[in-house]
Swiss-Prot record:
Subcellular location field: Cell membrane
Keywords from the UniProt entry: Cell membrane, Membrane, Transmembrane, Transmembrane helix
Primary location class: membrane
Record protein name field: Uncharacterized protein YjeT
Membrane-traversing stretches: 4-24, 45-65
Length: 65
């Protein structure tokens, strides 16, 4: 279980690093556009990502475990 968490974290880091590595200009543009969004929109977006991550986690946990 402990190694699974580290593997998941490593995958997140790889996926998060692909944007700035492959498309730095587009990544900067996206980040600057996000700073102009209202806080409630950012909270909804973040909450949606958390919910999606939890759903995928439980789906994979039932399938694999």
């Amino acid at each position: 279980m402990n190694s699974t968490i580290w593997l998941a974290l490593a995958l997140v880091l790889v996926l998060e690093g692909l944007g700035p590595m492959l498309y730095p200009k587009a990544w900067k543009k996206m980040i600057s556009a996000m700073t102009n969004l209202p806080d409630n929109i950012l909270r909804r977006f973040g909450g949606g990502l958390v919910v999606a991550g939890v759903v995928v986690y439980y789906m994979l946990r039932k399938t694999i475990g």
